[in-house]
């Protein structure tokens, strides 16, 4: 392992804000050890103040890292090096003594459920990257809380970074600053170390003034040491270490040890016309509409949806047996393309101020632009693409990167739930799994039991563009929408979910599966989606209340005739939308069987195997 971070205080960095003396002892040791290793010129201990934020933005503007968007209030645009635009699964690793602690050993080929790296290989990689990596730069010390400060479900981290973009983004995405250090005291924290990997003076010029080191990028998680170590990328998912690295990969491992769940799920509150409210959590793969569902304007009169979170849920059963959930984040880091007044009016309202945009296009009047924004341009207004080139609608290339983002405070969302920062969390009564399935999978079905529901999560598949070929679409396995984010062996993760059924007094939520994306033979969507999805939530609400509105099918319960409220909705072919074809499902079950047998292999819990066999049996009798 890399030398335990470190003793001896031979570093010359000058502390330009805050004081090392004021830090809790363990934090101070962490800062000093890494200052000695990375050799920054300055150390800045972040206080999280408005003033500090303003100074960071001004500094980045001066350096040409961001520019001000004059059309909005305190909004900024960053354009990255085109080689640093997304999470990189091939360079994201988990280090444990045994490979099997991280991933099941697959029958053939490589695991698709995570990447393990040995301690020896990591030590070499670490020592080839970090010594001196912050020369000439400032090391920022970011104390942050995932979850409302003081919540029993919250966890604290300290991130050291040489990127002011990371500091500014972390101030939006987490609770950050002095109050966190006060709450931490001598408590435990997750150690996060991040460097863009560009010591000064530069060896080669930056692209777009964006510091990164793509050749040496590595994002490493050391769950046994409660550490995250990231090098070479400034992009959100790789550098905002509170997000996927901590809130999913490290937290899922903590959750297994401590008896809770850390999941890639939105959390929403839905209130019926009588004023009765329920909370639901939903797991969809990235870019399948989590943010749109979490911020939905229901088309059904009298129904109301409110947003607790759009991406991550930390959930734990309380003493009364209610599954309580918090959103560990403080902001939304949303995909911009496709966001419009039609698809997500509440997101559009949220991002009008105090927002950092990354890799979207800019209009000549100081606004933002992207594919699917659906906004008419004023006469004479031109567009500059994310590659900083003039762009015209007829151009073949998109104006915004497909993974371009907005980073915006959750508190600005017009429909943020009144309990979104409740320290004890909100009670979850339904869990929804879903993906993008053009054929075969009905609009909604309900699992037969908790065990069957866990199987449904394990069997999740979703259409993804085959990035390698740029040809057709392929259906990818994405169990629990967690495939890129598991912090430990997926077989053990399934066993952990199954174990929730044995908690004393646990009120297990109902589990549902949805598919907004089924198409007819001409390739047209069978369901209008967006605000109309409230009709599906209404049916779930009734089911949770014990309504007799479902009929049994081989794959689960679907709405009875006329149980789904389609009032005012013309032209929906219900038969096609809910059709369950024996031929399709025989193939589907074979595919799931092959995947679980190959990928989870001997770590597959018996209960999941039993659910698979039972489903096979039911389909064969259709």
From Swiss-Prot:
Location(s), subcellular: Cytoplasm, Cytosol; Endoplasmic reticulum
Cofactor(s) needed: Mn(2+)
GO annotation terms (biological process): cellular hyperosmotic salinity response; cellular hypotonic salinity response; cellular response to cAMP; cellular response to fructose stimulus; cellular response to glucagon stimulus; cellular response to glucose stimulus; cellular response to hypoxia; cellular response to insulin stimulus
Pfam families: PEPCK_GTP (PF00821), PEPCK_N (PF17297)
Record PTM text: Acetylated. Lysine acetylation by p300/EP300 is increased on high glucose conditions and promotes ubiquitination by UBR5, acetylation is enhanced in the presence of BAG6. Deacetylated by SIRT2. Deacetylated by SIRT1. Ubiquitination by UBR5 leads to proteasomal degradation.
Active site (record annotation): 288
PROSITE patterns per record: PEPCK_GTP
Amino-acid positions noted as binding GTP in the UniProt annotation, renumbered to this chain: 287-292, 405, 436, 530-533
GO cellular component, one term: endoplasmic reticulum
Residues bearing PTM N6-acetyllysine: 70-71, 91, 473, 521, 524
Gene Ontology MF annotations: carboxylic acid binding; GDP binding; GTP binding; magnesium ion binding; manganese ion binding; phosphoenolpyruvate carboxykinase (GTP) activity; phosphoenolpyruvate carboxykinase activity; protein serine kinase activity (using GTP as donor)
Known catalytic reactions: oxaloacetate + GTP = phosphoenolpyruvate + GDP + CO2; L-seryl-[protein] + GTP = O-phospho-L-seryl-[protein] + GDP + H(+)
Details of cofactor binding: Binds 1 Mn(2+) ion per subunit.
Disruption phenotype: Mice do not survive beyond 2 to 3 days after birth.
UniProt binding sites for substrate: 87, 235-237, 286, 403-405
Modes of activity regulation: Phosphoenolpyruvate carboxykinase activity is regulated by acetylation and glucose levels. The anaplerotic conversion of phosphoenolpyruvate to oxaloacetate is improved by PCK1 acetylation on Lys-91 (K91ac), Lys-473 (K473ac) and Lys-521 (K521ac). High glucose concentrations favor PCK1 anaplerotic activity by triggering acetylation on Lys-91 (K91ac). At low glucose levels, SIRT1-mediated deacetylation of Lys-91 promotes the cataplerotic conversion of oxaloacetate to phosphoenolpyruvate.
Gene3D superfamilies: 3.90.228.20, Phosphoenolpyruvate Carboxykinase, domain 1, Phosphoenolpyruvate Carboxykinase, domain 2
Domain of life according to the entry: Eukaryota
InterPro entries: PEP_carboxykin_GTP_CS, PEP_carboxykinase_C, PEP_carboxykinase_GTP, PEP_carboxykinase_GTP_C, PEP_carboxykinase_GTP_N, PEP_carboxykinase_N
Key words, A-Z: Acetylation, Cytoplasm, Decarboxylase, Endoplasmic reticulum, Gluconeogenesis, GTP-binding, Kinase, Lyase, Manganese, Metal-binding, Nucleotide-binding, Phosphoprotein, Transferase, Ubl conjugation
Phosphoserine PTM positions: 19, 90, 118, 286
Subunit structure: Monomer.
Homology family: Belongs to the phosphoenolpyruvate carboxykinase [GTP] family.
Additional free-text comment from the UniProt record: In eukaryotes there are two isozymes: a cytoplasmic one and a mitochondrial one.
Record's protein name: Phosphoenolpyruvate carboxykinase, cytosolic [GTP]
Lineage summary: Eukaryota, Metazoa, Chordata, Craniata, Vertebrata
